């Protein structure tokens, strides 16, 4: 047996959490910090100094030499600048370790060097980071040493949000405020806050690092641009939940330990559908902490993989022909006195509060399906969505048989007198127990599915931050809650008003419910008849952010200003254009410097073989046929390469970033696909096989 691991002892040991604060802070200071965490507000300068000193002392005792304001700019990954704790030496030349409350609360990175969509120019560089007191500081150890990481928000000198966290925190306040209005109407006077909770299921690939380093396309783009299918892929369906191989198991073990030390509740691990694909799922947490922890998970996966001679691939579609990777975003809302607003109970037809919440969510998703789709838009996700492995690009809601039956009754009669029950599942084996059976099945093809006491948003890409999807979810549901509360707070007869409102919302927005096969062509046709948007690509979703509907929504709840939304639309176009340009240039480079020279060399060998066989007095029928085929494909590839070079140059020279991004989508990408198709039949030497294991 291996050494026994005491998970309880190591969990959170590298986190400055509430337990550590309680031990190290004076009682009155701890109470003030806890109050600000729970109710908002600011710490007094004196309190901030005490907290900063305690945090610094704890970090230094654990080997830290530097601290950083750890934030999430609009690149989608985290950013950090390390400052050491050293201060001015005293008169005796002794170094003093310093860290003030001001340094804890505020930092000042260069705002012009991050994506801003025009909010910051090069000569307007000042930006600020602000401590997110609700997300605990943690220690990160790597080749640079031990660093104290302080989760922060990031904004410009003029106050615009330049990150993913600030809008998320704003949206959390919005949904809390509006949800409280609803629960108050149902007599709950104890709750003071409603929290959005999130649990993201992170999928990823692991490949051997040495094989990875031989692939220029994987290095530069995160996915293979050339290659042929492996003889065996996922056809036998034997990888999903299969036995975890030793090398991968060793990686997972180290990953768990690293994450547990960082306070990340890594819970579930298993093989996924595609060869070399795996999943890690944590326990639910408050939305902003879940976002921070998901960034930590992705970063730690990459670091631990290197240690094991592996490379972690987070791209949504690193290999054609097998499933890509997503990040199912499980979302629920809970009061601080312990009530999950998405828990239907044993008899959901009698749970009026749940039915109102459900009706509001149906309304929110129907009205803002375009925004929800945009929140999961990503360059890599364009290759994954709607490919019989992931949800379609059409937003719909799966409720299951039980809730759909309740909704049907409410629409038809205004009340639901019954609901379907789960019953028992008989195994037919005397030594096995009869199993409690859920009242409804699960639908893996739905992009937004109710799964018992939460909604699972399955569109999110594996490499993407979960901040935007949860910001959007919180915002659109907050709006629906607000509009419902506006009606019900004025009602003379609350019981009648709430029943009428539930029926109204469900009747008007029933079109968004779909319990069938989301992969089918019939659903695409049906969705069009229902008037549901089918937004197929990242850049086609960009302008949904700046419609009047979207601007009114986000400005009403102070989540985004119009300028912030316009900047994000601009960044989407820029990101898309740059990403596709990198792929095109990588493809050009590989074709011109690696593949075509290899084909030429191969054809030379074939030509020599033809001559040698002829010289031996035998007709080289097969060899000549193969040589002709290779030369024909070589000519096609060279011609296609010339077209791609021309189209890439034309697109990269464009100045209008929106027009440029669509040029890449409509012209450059098809040129890339054309060149790939000319090569596949003959270039057996380019096989990019999916490994059965890393």
Language-model segments: which ranges?
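Basic/polar N-terminal segments that are highly enriched at the extreme N-terminus
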Residues: 1-8
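Active-site proximal loops enriched in glycine and acidic residues that flank catalytic Cys/His/Asp
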Residues: 47, 71, 100-101, 282, ...
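Glycine-rich, acidic/polar active-site loops that bind/position phosphate-bearing ligands
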Residues: 125-314, 323-326, 333-572
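C-terminal low-complexity, glycine/proline- and small-hydrophobic-enriched intrinsically disordered tails
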Residues: 430, 466-472, 494-677, 694
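Hydrophobic topology marker
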Residues: 685-687
């Amino acid at each position: 047996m291996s050494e026994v691991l005491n998970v309880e002892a190591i969990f959170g040991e590298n986190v400055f959490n509430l337990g550590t604060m309680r031990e190290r802070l004076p009682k009155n200071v701890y109470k003030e910090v806890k109050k600000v965490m729970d109710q908002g507000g600011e710490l007094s300068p004196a309190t901030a100094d005490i907290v900063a000193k305690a945090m610094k002392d704890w970090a230094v005792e654990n080997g830290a030499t530097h601290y950083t304001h750890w934030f999430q700019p609009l690149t989608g990954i985290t950013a950090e600048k390390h400052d050491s704790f050293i201060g001015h030496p005293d008169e005796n030349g002794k170094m003093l370790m310093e860290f003030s409350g001001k340094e804890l609360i505020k930092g000042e990175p260069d705002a012009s060097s991050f994506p801003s969509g025009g909010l910051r120019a090069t000569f307007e560089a000042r930006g600020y980071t602000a401590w997110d007191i609700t997300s605990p500081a943690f220690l990160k150890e790597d080749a640079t040493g031990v660093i104290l990481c302080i989760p922060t928000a990031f904004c410009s000198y003029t106050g615009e949000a330049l990150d993913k966290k600030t809008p998320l925190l704003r949206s959390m306040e919005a949904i809390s405020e509006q949800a409280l209005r609803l629960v108050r109407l149902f007599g709950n006077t104890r709750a003071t806050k409603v929290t959005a909770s999130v649990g993201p299921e992170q999928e990823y690939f692991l490949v051997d690092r040495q094989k990875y380093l031989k692939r220029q396309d994987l290095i530069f783009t995160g996915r293979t641009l050339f290659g042929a299918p492996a003889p065996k892929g996922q056809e036998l369906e034997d990888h999903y939940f299969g036995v975890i191989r030793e090398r991968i198991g060793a990686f997972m073990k180290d990953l768990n330990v690293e994450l547990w030390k960082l306070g990340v509740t890594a819970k579930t691990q298993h093989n996924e559908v595609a060869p070399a694909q795996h999943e890690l799922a944590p326990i639910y947490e408050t939305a902003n902490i879940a976002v921070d922890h998901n960034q930590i998970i992705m970063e730690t996966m990459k670091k631990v993989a290197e240690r094991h001679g592996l490379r972690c691939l987070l791209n949504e579609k690193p290999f054609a022909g097998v499933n890509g990777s997503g990040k199912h975003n499980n979302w629920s809302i809970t009061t601080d006195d312990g009530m999950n607003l998405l828990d239907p109970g044993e008899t959901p037809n009698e749970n009026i509060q749940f039915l109102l919440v459900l009706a509001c969510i149906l309304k929110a998703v129907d009205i803002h399906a375009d925004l929800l789709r945009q929140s999961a838009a990503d360059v890599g996700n364009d290759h994954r969505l709607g490919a019989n492995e992931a949800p379609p690009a059409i937003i719909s809601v799966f409720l299951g048989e039980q809730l759909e039956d309740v909704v049907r009754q409410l629409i038809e009669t205004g009340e639901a007198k019954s609901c379907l029950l789960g019953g028992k599942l008989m195994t037919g084996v005397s030594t096995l127990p009869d199993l409690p059976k859920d009242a409804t099945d699960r639908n893996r093809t739905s992009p937004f599915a109710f799964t018992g006491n939460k909604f699972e948003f399955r569109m999110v890409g594996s490499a993407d931050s979960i901040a935007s999807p949860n910001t959007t979810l919180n915002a659109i549901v907050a709006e629906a809650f607000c509009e419902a509360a506006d009606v019900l707070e004025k009602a003379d007869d609350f019981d009648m008003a709430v029943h009428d409102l539930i029926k109204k919302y469900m009747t008007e927005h029933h079109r968004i419910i779909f319990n069938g096969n989301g992969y089918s062509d019939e659903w695409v046709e049906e969705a069009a008849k229902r008037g549901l948007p089918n937004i197929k690509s990242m850049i086609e979703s960009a302008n949904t952010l700046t419609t009047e509907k979207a601007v009114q929504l986000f400005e009403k709840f102070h989540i985004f200003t119009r300028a912030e939304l316009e900047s994000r639309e601009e960044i989407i176009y820029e990101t898309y254009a740059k990403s596709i340009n990198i792929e095109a240039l990588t493809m050009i480079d590989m074709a011109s410097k690696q593949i075509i020279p290899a084909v030429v060399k191969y054809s030379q060998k074939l030509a020599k073989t033809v001559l040698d066989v002829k010289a031996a007095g035998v007709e080289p029928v097969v060899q000549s046929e193969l040589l002709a085929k290779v030369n024909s494909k070589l000519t096609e590839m060279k011609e296609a390469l010339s077209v791609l070079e021309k189209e890439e140059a034309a697109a990269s020279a464009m100045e209008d970033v929106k027009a440029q991004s669509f040029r890449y989508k409509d012209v450059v990408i098809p040129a890339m696909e054309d060149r790939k198709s000319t090569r596949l039949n003959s270039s057996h030497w380019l096989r990019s096989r999916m490994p059965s294991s890393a």
